[in-house]
Design a protein with these regions (language model features):
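Short, conserved loop/turn and helix-capping segments at secondary-structure boundaries
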Residues: 42, 105, 109, 156-161
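Active-site nucleotide/adenylate-binding loops and adjacent lid/helix of ATP-dependent enzymes
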Residues: 1-68, 78-82, 109-112
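A long amphipathic alpha-helix within ATP-dependent nucleotide-binding catalytic cores
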Residues: 55-56, 98-141, 145-147
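Short beta-strand scaffold segments in enzyme catalytic cores
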Residues: 72-75
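Glycine-rich phosphate/pyrophosphate-binding beta-alpha loops
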Residues: 92-103, 145-159
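A glycine-rich, hydrophobic loop/mini-helix early in the fold
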Residues: 85-89
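Short acidic-glycine loop/turn motifs at beta-strand connectors
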Residues: 77-83, 134-137
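Peripheral (often C-terminal) accessory segments that flank ATP-dependent C-N-forming ligase machineries
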Residues: 16, 135, 164-211
Length: 211
């Protein structure tokens, strides 16, 4: 089953200090919608609390740091306790905000079993992303997102087209629910510069398409 690291929601610096004393360092200070920062001191924790609260509001989440590998699972629940498919990924590269910038497909039996148990208990309907720390057979749920992640095309590229399966399920069509994919497939996100005119750029902003 999924385990949860000690997690406390705080709404003031006084509550932050109490949570920090209970959890101990290192720990994470996280926004309710976005951003997570690993901190080592109370000064760092207080600074990140103020920064996150100013952007994302309260409460701010304080969470114990857990040792292990950062693994993610993306999938789709059928709403009846089953799964329309899932893909496990190990993070190999992170952005400055801790988001996955690169990853490699893995298959971790304990993590798959924990994800399947979650879908069964919650009767989960629709897409999901589980962000986990895995140490041996211990699987700690760090975050759950009720949506497809930005890297969902990676799952389709390795043979498990989750968005297509979701649409088929919604339409009442037969869905291939296998989760067969090759372990060791890798993706790396990158960016590039586009050169254009101001007129064309403004047209995209105002019309939503190029002319």
């Amino acid at each position: 089953d999924l385990q949860l690291p000690l997690t406390i929601a705080v709404t003031s610096e006084a509550e932050l200090y109490t949570a920090v004393n209970r959890i101990g360092f290192p720990l994470y200070v996280k926004g309710i919608f976005y951003e997570a920062y690993r901190v080592q001191t109370i000064v760092e924790a207080a600074a990140q609390f103020r920064n996150i609260a100013a952007v994302w509001g309260l409460p701010v989440i304080v969470q114990a740091a857990v040792q292990g590998d950062e693994l993610n699972v993306v999938g789709v629940g059928d709403g009846a306790g089953g799964c329309l498919g899932m893909v496990g990924v190990k993070k190999t590269s992170l952005s400055s905000l801790g988001k996955m910038w690169g990853g490699v497909t893995i298959r971790h039996p304990a993590m798959v079993a924990a994800a399947e148990r979650l879908l069964e208990v919650c009767q989960w309907r629709g897409p999901f992303e589980l962000e986990c720390i895995v140490n041996g057979d211990d699987v700690f749920l760090i975050e759950i997102n009720p949506r497809f992640p930005a890297w969902v095309y990676f799952a389709a590229a390795v043979g498990v087209n989750l968005p297509a399966r979701l649409i088929q399920h919604i339409r009442g069509e037969d869905v291939d629910t296998n989760s067969d994919y090759e372990v060791g497939q890798q993706f790396l996100r990158y960016s590039w510069e586009m050169i254009t005119t101001m007129e064309r750029f403004q047209h995209v902003l105002t019309q939503g398409e190029t002319n």
